[in-house]
């Protein structure tokens, strides 16, 4: 599964080459497209000339998780098989949700909302970048995008999540154990994901210095 906004063009081309070589499909879950500030950052599907990409565009992040509606582009070879399975596993797709979304998209309201939500998260990430610059810490390597929900901080030392979790909770900081994101044979404890989805700009300014100090103790 590939979140497209973390991949550069060369990486995309290499992934497509490997998909063709080994005759496998790539599922591209384009959940962050609505937050992307780079209009030239095309999805992997854009480069696919061999029908190896299954492209999914969800509205759960930009609108609401409970909407449960997405757009899907499938390679011709597996369309009929997919529709057959969908018929038996998803017999009650909400007509109301689909109709409401269609009206919302067609009216132009979504475009206005998309612009406002993109600015909101651009501002939050900008504050995060600024706060990190103002609180330098040796051994911490940050990857902060220009917009979106998530940033990443890497520690030099392998630091199990359960080791720092009590101190995080004590300071009202909630992080996810990102070791679960890795295949078992590649699992490590160097990376921590930071989300700004539920934190406003003031909370980011107050919380990030605390996080940096805590991580610094274990690094």
Language-model segments: residues:
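PLP-dependent class I/II
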Residues: 1-219
């Amino acid at each position: 599964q590939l979140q497209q906004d973390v991949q550069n063009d060369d990486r995309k081309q290499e992934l497509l080459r490997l998909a063709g070589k080994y005759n496998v499909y790539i599922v591209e879950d384009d959940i962050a497209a609505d937050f992307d500030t780079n209009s030239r950052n095309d999805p992997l599907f854009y480069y696919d000339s061999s029908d190896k990409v299954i492209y999914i565009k969800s509205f759960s992040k930009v609108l609401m998780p409970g909407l449960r509606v997405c757009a899907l582009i499938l390679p011709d070879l597996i369309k009929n098989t997919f529709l057959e399975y969908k018929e038996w596993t998803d017999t009650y797709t909400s007509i109301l949700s689909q109709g409401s979304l269609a009206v919302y998209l067609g009216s132009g309201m979504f475009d206005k909302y998309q612009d406002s939500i993109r600015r909101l998260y651009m501002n939050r990430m900008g504050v995060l970048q600024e706060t990190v610059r103002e609180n330098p810490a040796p051994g911490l390597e940050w990857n902060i995008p220009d917009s979106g929900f998530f940033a990443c901080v890497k520690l030099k030392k392998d630091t199990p999540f359960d080791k720092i979790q009590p101190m995080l909770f004590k300071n009202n900081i909630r992080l996810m154990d990102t070791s679960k994101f890795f295949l078992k044979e590649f699992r490590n404890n160097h990376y921590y994901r930071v989300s700004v989805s539920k934190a406003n700009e003031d909370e980011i300014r107050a919380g990030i210095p605390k996080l940096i100090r805590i991580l610094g103790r274990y690094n």
